[in-house]
Amino acid sequence: MSALTNLLQSIEKITLTNRDKGTSFENLMVQYFLNEPKYAELYTEVLSYADWVEKYGEKLNITDKRDYGIDLVAVTMGGEFHPIQCKNYNTTKIQKKDIDSFLGGSGKSYFSYRYIVASTDDWTDNAKSSLLDAHPPVATISLLDLEGSLIDCDAKTRPIC
């Protein structure tokens, strides 16, 4: 079993609520986007949606901090905004209804690219098809992708794991 799988199982065991489980996974994904070389070269910061609204909302005329399924927002070196939804669904299949609010809430002109990060590789066909030809585009980062991270989760100094 991989270090990441062990960590996800630890989160599952030690968190008391689904909300805590989700928040722990979101915090892990902040570190993933800031430390995984592919993303670390692209992003200057990754913020919770509420913190992003606090920092950039006035400039974009956004006052509502309700996230509508957006958990995090990554800010590119060029100043673009990429919303991220984090799904910690270890044993559950992701259905279209699980991502509908994110797709609606993140389909704004100030977002140029979107991510859904999931701790599963199991998606319904309807969920997969809802991402095709979406605008802005949506990329998925699956458990398999996370497992293939270049971050050494077995190292003594663990930036995210």
Model-identified regions with their sequence ranges:
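Glycine/serine-rich loop-strand microenvironments at binding/catalytic pocket rims
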Residues: 1-23, 27-31
